[in-house]
Amino acid sequence: RRSRLGVLFKLLCLAALVAALTFGATVFFQVETIAVTGDSRYTQDEIIAASGVQVGDNLFRMNKKQISQEILHQLPYVESVSILRGLPSTITFQVTEWDAVAQVEVYAQGQTEESGEEGESQQAAAKEAWLISVGGKLLEPVSASHTAPISVTGLTALAPEAGSMLAVPQDQQSKLTALTNVLEQLQQQGMISRVSSVDLTHVSCMVLRLDGSIDAKLPLTGDTAYYLRALNAAVEEENRRRGGQAVGTMDLTQKEYTAIFTPAESGG
């Protein structure tokens, strides 16, 4: 009987301790300071408002994942948010942002809406060009003051909404994958500023306008990183051979050769 009483006493003490800690966390760890760090096109007030966090909220009862998702959804240019608790009463949002690297132009050809299993036609094609991030996140419509360095043709954006991912008809999915792959590799290899357009209107290849003088034909599938390295090397070699900037087409879609250069015809 004494043993049972001892166990019961310990359990009661443990429950009291948990209750005390919970009460203490509720009373003493309330948000008094909200800070935002990182370069941002959004103001501190905009980021805090999107988070939904308010002074007086409990530091340990907030759902950090849900808060991050709210910020990412409401503020399209935000790439990631780290939420840091600083005892006793500070919460800090560390924000990184996407750059608008490309703009998806209006494309009228191809499938412009999809139908559900019961025949509902649902997703309308975009009627204006949209800015996207490297990963294909829709940022905002193109305007006179907001543009991107790379123009993309050959994709039909469906039901675009800022903060969502670029969606296209099923028959363009492989081209969308090719686009995000090439944008990622262009960024990693420091080539974004050298490319002015990506043409995805062709069936089996994409065409990049490079350095304002080279139309580079790349396969839609395969090792995009390798193709870009090979392209860069081939263009450098052609420029050296000609003693200046080469003008023409560089074809990397032929199995027999790494790259084939065809000079542009001179007008005359």
Task: Identify the residue ranges that each predicted region occupies.
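Charged, solvent-exposed interaction patches on well-folded alpha/beta domains
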Residues: 1-18, 23, 56, 80-268
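Structural recognition of beta-strand segments within beta-rich domains
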Residues: 73-75, 83
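Conserved short hydrophobic interaction patches
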Residues: 50, 74, 234-238
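Preference for short coil/turn "hinge" residues that link or interrupt alpha-helices
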Residues: 22-24, 35, 46, 52-55, ...
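Short extracytoplasmic
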Residues: 40-73
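Aromatic-capped interface at the extracytoplasmic side
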Residues: 18-39
